[in-house]
Each structure stands twice: as C-alpha cells, then as structure tokens.
Amino acid sequence: MERFILDTSVFTNPDTFNQFARDAVEATRIFLQLARRADAEFFIPGSVYEEFRLMKDLASLGGDFESVVKIRSPRRYSLTIPSEFLYELIHEVRHRIDRGLRIAEEHARMAAQPGTVADQGALITRLRERYRETLRRGIVDSREDIDVLLLAYELDGVLLSADEGLRKWADKVGVKIILPQHLRRVLENLTSCSRPQK
C-alpha cells in the first residue's frame, strides 16, 4: 500500500485543486471521497495541517479530513538524513543570499541616481518581488516544507505537492513524487485498483 504525504499546496494551489472543483473547500471534500476509497494511506505533518487550517475554514470537513488523513509529524530527533543534503542546502542558501544582496545593491544604486526613480513605492515593490523570487523559488523555505520532506523520507512515501522547491529537494534525497497535475487521475487509478476484480 502506497503512502502519500500531503503539502498544503494540494488544497490551496488553484492549479492543483481545480482538478477536483473550483472552490478549495469543495475540492478538499472530493479529494477526501477519492482518498477514502483508494488503496493508499495519506499523511500530513501537524505543522502543515495547522497551516492549512489557518488558510482554509475546515469546520465542515475537519472530522472527515482527520478520519482519512493521518496527522503525524516526522521523528525529527531520531531521523537520519544524508549529510550531503545539508551541505547542498547550505550551499544553495549562501548562493541565494549573495544573489539577493546583488539585487538590493542594484536597487540602492537606482534609488541614489537623481531623476531615475519617479516612484519610490514602485521601486520598493520591484525590489521585494525580485528578492523574494531569488531567495525562495526552488528551495525548501519553511519549517512546514521540511516537515513534509522529512515525513516523506521517513515513511518512504510519495510526496504530493505543487511546491516546485519542495519537489526538487525531495528528489535529491530519493523521495517519490507525483506531479500535482496528475493527482486526481492517480487517486482514481488507486480507487479502481482497490476494487475486487470480477
């Protein structure tokens, strides 16, 4: 039986949840119906579940969600991960910090030149967008991301996430991945596989 580890993006990213319904809560309900019948187990770390509950009102689905999806955090204090993963992560973060610094310097020079900046607000907005893109895209950038990654690694599970950085780093440590655009079809296939053959 396959084990699937869920990230909030499955339920909050429109490109992913639109496979099920236009509304995120309705999409979650349909996901749960399919997951309940699938020959699979579903997990979500506690930190990710809390994040999800803050983003979406699950009052009507909380009991259903918790009866289908197991809420379990990774065993952070006993789990062993390859040291190369940590080495690469630190190298990547350092590289991104340096790139972010160059972006900040570029915008500081633009602001210092007389007559080049008509709208300081627009300059700051542009700086924030470029800085955020440089530092966060394609990397695990939160405790919740790490919890999902570690739990998938620990359980030898399949990662379900629309987060490109999380998928990239999961692949580095050998975690199985399903692309988010295939989620509904995979669930339907697992549902049909669990039915007895005639």
From Swiss-Prot:
CDD domains: PIN_VapC-like (cd18691). GO terms for biological process: tRNA 5'-leader removal. Its EC number is 3.1.26.5. Pfam families: PIN_5. GO terms for molecular function: ribonuclease P activity. It catalyses: Endonucleolytic cleavage of RNA, removing 5'-extranucleotides from tRNA precursor. SUPFAM superfamilies: PIN domain-like. Keywords: Endonuclease, Hydrolase, Nuclease, tRNA processing. PANTHER family: RNA-FREE RIBONUCLEASE P, UPF0278 PROTEIN TK1425. RNA-free RNase P that catalyzes the removal of the 5'-leader sequence from pre-tRNA to produce the mature 5'-terminus. Belongs to the HARP family. HAMAP family: RNA_free_RNase_P. This is RNA-free ribonuclease P. It comes from Nitrosococcus oceani (strain ATCC 19707 / BCRC 17464 / JCM 30415 / NCIMB 11848 / C-107).
